[in-house]
């Protein structure tokens, strides 16, 4: 189960924005976040049409999952033989992880659209309409 499934779309959006604002401090970071919020479908787009994240908010959920996994890997790898639970990433490392993970699929904004599709219902054998991404 991912963050979106556990907490809902609005909470996932807030979580993304909190991570972004807390960790990304480069020039124009605020403009980037504003662009994502106001001019793209980043927070509602799917991450694919058929595979993981092929649902509303899938791109957001995928980006958050990548962030949390990458951060855990970075802490584990950088901690070495130390207790990973005690290791803290530097501000620069936190920023790097946030940028890489949260924005790695930003090129997918505006790529998918919801359309009516047709499929054969396996239970009834009848063709039916459904909403799917293309």
Where are these regions (language model features)?
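Non-catalytic interface/linker regions that flank or bridge core catalytic/transmembrane domains
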Residues: 1-45, 49
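Active-site flanking loop/helix segments enriched in acidic
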Residues: 38-62, 133-134
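Divalent metal-dependent catalytic cores for phosphoryl transfer on phosphate-bearing substrates
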Residues: 49, 55, 75-79, 84-134
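Divalent metal-coordination and catalytic microenvironments
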Residues: 66
């Amino acid at each position: 189960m991912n963050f979106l499934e556990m907490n809902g779309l609005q909470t996932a959006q807030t979580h993304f924005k909190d991570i972004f604002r807390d960790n990304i401090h480069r020039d124009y970071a605020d403009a980037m976040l504003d662009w994502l919020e106001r001019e793209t479908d980043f927070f509602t787009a799917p991450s694919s049409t058929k595979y993981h994240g092929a649902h509303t908010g899938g791109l957001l959920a995928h980006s958050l999952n990548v962030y949390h996994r990458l951060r855990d890997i970075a802490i584990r790898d950088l901690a070495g033989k130390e207790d990973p639970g005690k290791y803290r990433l530097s501000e620069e490392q936190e920023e790097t992880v946030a940028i890489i993970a949260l924005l790695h699929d930003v090129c997918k904004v505006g790529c998918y659209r919801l359309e009516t599709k047709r499929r054969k219902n396996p239970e009834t054998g009848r063709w039916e309409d459904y909403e799917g991404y293309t």
